[in-house]
From Swiss-Prot:
Role in flagellar biosynthesis. The lineage of its organism: Bacteria, Pseudomonadati, Spirochaetota, Spirochaetia, Spirochaetales. InterPro entries: FliR (IPR006303), T3SS_IM_R (IPR002010). The keyword Methyltransferase does not apply. This is Flagellar biosynthetic protein FliR. It is a multi-pass membrane protein. One of its GO terms (cellular component) is bacterial-type flagellum basal body. It comes from Borreliella burgdorferi (strain ATCC 35210 / DSM 4680 / CIP 102532 / B31) (Borrelia burgdorferi). Keywords: Bacterial flagellum, Cell membrane, Membrane, Transmembrane, Transmembrane helix. Pfam families: Bac_export_1 (PF01311). Belongs to the FliR/MopE/SpaR family. GO terms for biological process: bacterial-type flagellum assembly; protein targeting. It is found in: Cell membrane; Bacterial flagellum basal body. The chain crosses the membrane at residues 11-31, 36-56, 75-95, 127-147, 190-210, 219-239. PANTHER family: FLAGELLAR BIOSYNTHETIC PROTEIN FLIR (PTHR30065), SURFACE PRESENTATION OF ANTIGENS PROTEIN SPAR (PTHR30065:SF1).
Length: 269
């Protein structure tokens, strides 16, 4: 009797592990390529954290995977990995809004070639972009945004989006979803950087008028130093309002991410 109980418990553990594995693959791919957990320095943490989350979330899933056909199960794992990458792609769009703001701003004040090594992404990035990225991380970690990130990106997505519906995906709806995400990226980046860019544009317009009226003025030296000083001054003065607008953008981004997941679930179905 004890022997058969051990066999039944072993079979239960095997079936449970095969149920957890697809969820683990999706959560791991989502966290691995998200901007907060993408560094290779915490790769082992990603795996164990994904395993813990998958064990918690899998209890709410009432789906039996086809374990009698290993090819079908392998395709399910591949589909779960693709869904995790798609979710990480949308989260990276939110994060890249602030990098794009820094890119716009750096080009206008003459710091396009001033780069700094980012220890998290392990690549060079512009100084102003790095400042905006750190601002984003501080705002993200100082509020309930991180909790909402896990609830929307892991809990809601696993419960609402199933990999079995990938075969019924309409290409037109998915392309529309991608175009909406890119439009969201440029819209939010321009909204944040528009006041700064408009002042710098006005400054360059004044310089153009001066160059016509006084051709002997060395505008190359004047424009670089003045635009750099003016840009840093605007950044210093407008930093509190910039933090408020950035926080609002993060809130809208998480709401948009939830809307994207709902739209994506309808597209798949």
């Amino acid at each position: 009797m004890y022997y058969w109980d051990e066999i039944l418990n072993l079979n239960f553990l095997v079936l449970k592990s095969f149920t957890i594995l697809p969820v683990l693959v999706r959560i791991f791919m989502f966290l691995k390529f998200s901007p907060f957990f993408s560094t290779i320095k915490i790769g082992y943490f990603n795996f164990f954290f994904s395993l813990i989350l998958s064990v918690i979330v899998v209890e709410k899933i009432k789906i039996i995977y086809p374990l009698d056909n290993m090819l079908s199960f392998a395709l399910i794992l591949l589909g779960e990995a693709i869904l995790g990458l798609i979710q990480a792609f949308f989260v990276n769009i939110i994060f890249n809004v602030f990098h794009l703001v820094g890119f716009f701003f750096s080009n206008q004040i003459g710091l396009a070639y001033a780069n700094i090594f980012d220890v998290f992404s392990e690549e060079d990035s512009m100084i102003i972009s790095q400042i905006f990225a750190y601002l984003f991380l501080l705002l993200f970690l100082s509020s309930d945004f991180l909790l909402r990130f896990f609830v929307i990106g892991i809990h809601d997505s696993v419960l609402n989006i199933r990999v079995e519906h990938l075969v019924n995906m309409r290409n037109s709806g998915f392309v529309k979803l991608l175009l909406m995400s890119f439009g969201f990226l440029f819209e939010k980046a321009l909204l944040i950087s528009f006041p700064i860019l408009s002042l710098l544009l006005l400054f360059y317009l004044v310089l153009g008028i001066l160059s016509k009226s006084s051709p002997q003025i060395n505008l190359l030296i004047i424009s670089f130093s003045t635009s750099l000083f003016l840009g840093l001054l605007i950044l210093y003065i407008g930093f509190p309002s910039l933090a408020i607008s950035s926080k609002r953008v993060i809130e809208l981004s998480l709401d948009s991410l939830a809307s994207f997941l709902k739209l994506f679930s309808r597209v798949l179905k």
